[in-house]
């Protein structure tokens, strides 16, 4: 029967919610009232909760929340341009914002308007040319100082992407239970970090049933391209090199459960496939 599982986490600039919304709206137009009659769960409550959650972190009762985009040349710009008006957020590029006395302002034809929160879709390394990459043309100079002064709320704050590392997936179930007293609502793929003796020994003893991946998303001595590989597909030489590197730098690796992904029929040029 199958079940839903989380394959990976996106925290730096999550993409996809806007595409789901666009797809739902397009399907609603095509199917007429069929979705309503089938009692399909609406997307609106999710976006309302997201918007209200951001607003709750702001000081003002009616905060101004801005979606910060890298600009129209980013691949997900269409999604951002669709999401912003749906949520009631101005869509702004770095040049549309200014930081004065550690406060963030939006440039408008009516003058500067205070910004209470930013939902940013910019690479964190480019978000503030004064704090990170000085060559960035898409960031907001002084934004990090405004964050440090607690004058603006930034969701997907710089550094959040660290939690995308596969190594953290090994601890999510226990962290969730410890912090919330409940299990994960949607289970992730079972993951074992080799930086712990028990995890390393378990992965080494079951290589043929594991997906071996870099623990922190970067190349390792054995996975030079930083891409995960099935243990069962490893040549003998690579397998020996991996086991040797487990002794030298076990913290660089994770073993992940191999899952069988679902498929669904599609209609193409040659009919149903």
What are these model-derived regions, one by one?
Residues 1-5, 9-273:
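Domain-scale recognition of functional cores that engage charged ligands
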């Amino acid at each position: 029967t199958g079940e839903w599982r989380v394959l990976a986490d996106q925290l730096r600039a999550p993409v996809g919610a806007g595409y789901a919304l666009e797809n739902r709206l397009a399907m609603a137009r095509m199917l007429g009232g069929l979705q309503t009659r089938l009692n399909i769960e609406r997307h609106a409550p999710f976006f309302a909760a997201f918007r209200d959650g951001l607003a709750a972190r702001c000081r003002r009762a009616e905060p101004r929340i801005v979606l910060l985009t890298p600009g129209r040349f980013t691949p997900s710009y269409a999604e951002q341009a669709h999401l912003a008006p749906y949520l009631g957020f101005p869509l702004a590029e770095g040049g549309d914002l200014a930081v004065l006395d550690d406060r963030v302002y939006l440039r408008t034809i009516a003058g500067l308007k205070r910004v209470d929160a930013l939902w940013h879709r910019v690479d964190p390394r480019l978000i503030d040319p004064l704090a990170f990459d000085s060559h960035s043309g898409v960031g907001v100079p002084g934004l990090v100082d405004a964050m440090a002064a607690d004058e603006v709320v930034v969701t997907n704050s710089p550094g959040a992407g660290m939690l995308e590392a596969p190594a953290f997936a090994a601890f999510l179930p226990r962290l969730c239970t410890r912090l919330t007293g409940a299990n994960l609502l949607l289970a992730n793929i079972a993951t074992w970090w080799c930086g712990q003796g028990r995890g390393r020994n378990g992965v080494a003893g079951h290589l043929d049933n594991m997906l071996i991946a870099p623990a922190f998303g970067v190349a390792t001595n054995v996975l030079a391209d930083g891409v995960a590989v099935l243990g069962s597909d490893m040549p003998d030489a690579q397998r020996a090199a991996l086991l040797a590197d487990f002794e030298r730098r076990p913290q660089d690796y994770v073993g992940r459960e191999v899952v069988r992904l679902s498929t669904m029929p599609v209609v193409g040029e040659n009919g149903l496939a």
